[in-house]
């Protein structure tokens, strides 16, 4: 048993498991809903993956390894910054895709978070990305504003409110 935080998020998407799998693993599709990033890999067990900026800089803000890939049911990856020193090892993200009639239950479990601060970050990040993914799959368009912008605005307002000046 670990004292390290774990984040779990469940969403329901009107799509097939194959469509959800494709949206999680196709670089061009991830670029549509993942805010200026795409996910690059061949998605084979043991392969590397990168969360690459789409600005042409070639910078990967997150990297990891594919631990498990069972299309279209389950994808497990490690996740860390490219230069992070994490004594307990990288985070681990599991995507479980379960069909139910005309919908899919997508469960994202992010384990081995380094601390409560990382938990707060992923608690804002995953719901934003998954809301955009859901909207994209159901409508063919992403949300009109990036949900992560709301978090940044709330954080800035909170910092201004707590500023003793």
Positions of predicted regions on the chain:
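Hydrophobic pocket/interface hotspot
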Residues: 20-21, 30, 49, 66, ...
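Vicinal oxygen chelate
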Residues: 58-62, 80-87
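A conserved amphipathic terminal alpha-helix motif
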Residues: 112-165
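Hydrophobic/aromatic beta-strand elements that line small-molecule binding cavities or substrate pockets
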Residues: 11, 62-68, 91-98
């Amino acid at each position: 048993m670990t004292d390290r935080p774990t984040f779990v998020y469940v969403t329901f998407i009107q799509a097939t498991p194959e469509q959800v799998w494709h949206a999680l693993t196709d670089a061009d599709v991830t670029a549509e809903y993942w805010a200026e990033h795409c996910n690059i890999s061949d998605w084979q067990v043991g392969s590397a993956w990168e969360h690459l900026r789409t600005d042409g800089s070639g910078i990967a803000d997150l990297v990891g390894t594919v631990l498990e890939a069972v299309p279209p049911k389950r994808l497990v990856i490690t996740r860390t910054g490219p230069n992070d020193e994490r004594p307990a090892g990288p985070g681990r993200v599991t995507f479980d895709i379960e069909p139910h009639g005309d919908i899919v239950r997508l469960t994202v479990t992010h384990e081995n978070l380094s601390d409560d601060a990382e938990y707060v970050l992923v608690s804002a990040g995953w719901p934003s990305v998954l809301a955009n993914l859901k909207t994209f799959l159901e409508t063919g368009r992403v949300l009109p504003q990036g949900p992560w912008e709301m978090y940044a605005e709330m954080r800035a307002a909170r910092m201004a409110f707590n500023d003793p000046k």
